[in-house]
Amino acid sequence: MTQKWMKTFCGYCYANCGINVLVKDGRIGRVKGDPDFPGSRGYLCPKGAAAAAVVHSGNRLQHPLLRTNGRFERISWHKALDTIATRLHEIRDRHGPETVLQLRGAPITQEIRDGFVQFMSAYGSPNYTGPSHLCSSPRRLGQELVLGNRTVADFKGTNCIVIWGANPTDSRNYAEGLIPERFFTVIPQAKKRGAKVIVIDPRQTELATSADEWVNIAVGTDMAFGLSLINVIIDQQLYDREFVEKWTVGFNLLKEHVRELTPEWAEKITEVPAGTIRHIATVYATTKPAAILDGNGLDQHPNVVQTVRVISMLAAITGNIDVSGGNVFAPKPKTAPYPTVHPQVKHLASEVIPLFPRVTAPYMIDALLTGKPYTPRALITHHTNPLLINANYRRVRQALEKLELIVVFDILPTATADLAHIILPAASDFERHGYGAWAGFDGGYVALQQKIIEPIGESRSVFDVEYELARRLGLKQHYPWTTNEEWINYKLSPLNVTFEELQRLHVIPVTPGIEYNKYSAKGFKTPSGKVELYCQKLKDHNQDPVPVFRPFAESQDLIEQYPLVGTTRRPGNYVHTRFRDVACLRKIQPEPLLRIHFRDARLRNIGDGDLAIVESPEGSISIKAMVTDEIRPGFVVVDFGWGNSWDGGPNVNILTSDQARCPLSGATPNRRFRCEITRNPVD
């Protein structure tokens, strides 16, 4: 028996924890955290520890499959690639390249982020994207409109920690250089030196139980809460006058805008007492420095971009931007530009969300169902499951079924793959080379995601597949690389780092640590060079230049029929819709749960463990109830990520709508839906 330990990093979530992998006779054996890896320093969550079970799963896709007469049959790679290339050639000639869509997964690894981007651009279609409307990108846009760039929370020297719509002990925010285990030490250490901890969340998360203040806010009302905080801070003159006068534009307009947006006004919307709002505003504004960690709980709402603008303004007017212990800019190592060619046409939602950098899936769905601005014909997906992750499942399914060609590239079967015409087996993160590049408080660094074992079955790297398709379509001249190793060399060339060096060193520092107060010399990366409390760019695009909270468009009849407000929760032991076939992870949480308050459960004769029916205007699901006091009455939480044919659980997006959208990012309200709950009579 041969065995050896090899270094790489995990690609199962944004944390990208460094790991040491024991390889026994060509198979993955034990996996443990790498104490030398800068970001994780030895920590490893259950997902990473289960790597062997994932890679060697009996459910792995191992061969190309072609749908024939309603069934999948095994075919060769040669036939699969030829078939796809022929269809793409026909579609391009008949309908134009822009009618081919591409969806990729969350950019957890660089291969997922970059996969098929060069191909789509060379082919001529601008309609490629990831789940950007659901995660991070809307928040990034909100911060960029105010501050010019994304910030991260600097907890090292802070005296006030605000966790807003985030749950970092369960779902790590990768940008902070913190992991769940270490985060458990950050809070006690901060509190020991007198720091205040504030958690703003409609659910009593683990952090909320130990916080100084848990703000039990109504779902989707964070903007109103933030505007009322600004009202108090300005009214009580708790803002940083020197910073505001020198480094902001539009303060007087903001001041006038929030004059009537008092805590009493916000209380009616947020269900947070006015006294609590005043207290939180005072604590945050007077406890310096203060850092805000925002999270995915803010993303999936129609007002997400404007909400994050408000949060950014809070940090700015209190002087907590780009200071030690506040919200700081952590520049990520700059890699080579990608793609190297660009389509000649704009993406199909460019007129609707012109400030967002890419098309989003809901507008692809619209185009498929309406034919406007044109009718898409084909879809290539890799490492994603759009049928389950997007709001309004029935509408998404109806749209996908209209496509002439669906190609799914993944390591495991998915609900989306069930609709595919061709399924291609993907190599796992342990079966091909990749790289990672991260910002860090102590400096940015790059690392090698190393090929640990040979690919299972006939699985291939995404770059192998897209290059072979490009070659068949006469596009290979657009590729500055042909292999994963050449791709790594190309992307890291501005950093003077090579694949060979990464093989030897594994981790290479490439940028210095965080610098504070950079704006004093360079200004902010906004049109004015200052923090923009009033945004002329938004005004020019007929959007609110100062954030305006608008009530939810819900009739009294709707509220009476569906009196409960629901949201979703992603269990931390899974990755979106993946890994529910992994026994050791399934043991942690074998099935999805509905969290419902004791009072609401009693009124509906629902006991803990009973099956309940959750019904919304869009549809209904049956799910086991968990009766709890960690949420407010009138509010329920449904677990997200189930719905594959083999996992035995319901898809929460049967309940959600995709019609109310953020006008700046296209974000849909996956995190808020009206519903009613009854006991399942078959229980």
Predicted regions and their residues:
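A glycine-rich phosphate-binding loop feature that marks nucleotide/adenosyl-phosphate handling sites
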Residues: 246-249, 284, 327-338, 481-495, ...
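Active-site phosphate/pyrophosphate-binding segments
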Residues: 229, 249-362
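Glycine/threonine-rich phosphate-binding loop and adjacent beta-strand/alpha-helix elements that clamp
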Residues: 430-455, 470
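Long, contiguous, secondary-structure-rich segments that constitute the structural scaffold
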Residues: 452, 456, 460-506, 577-595, ...
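N-terminal export/assembly segments and adjacent metallocofactor-ligating motifs
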Residues: 1-236, 265, 273, 602, ...
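Flexible, glycine/charged-enriched surface loops at secondary-structure junctions
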Residues: 96-99, 239-244, 291, 322-329, ...
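Extended redox/cofactor-interaction regions of prokaryotic respiratory oxidoreductases
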Residues: 114-189, 195-200, 224-227, 312-418, ...
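Flexible glycine/proline-enriched surface loops and loop-helix/loop-strand junctions
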Residues: 167, 210-211, 260-265, 293-298, ...
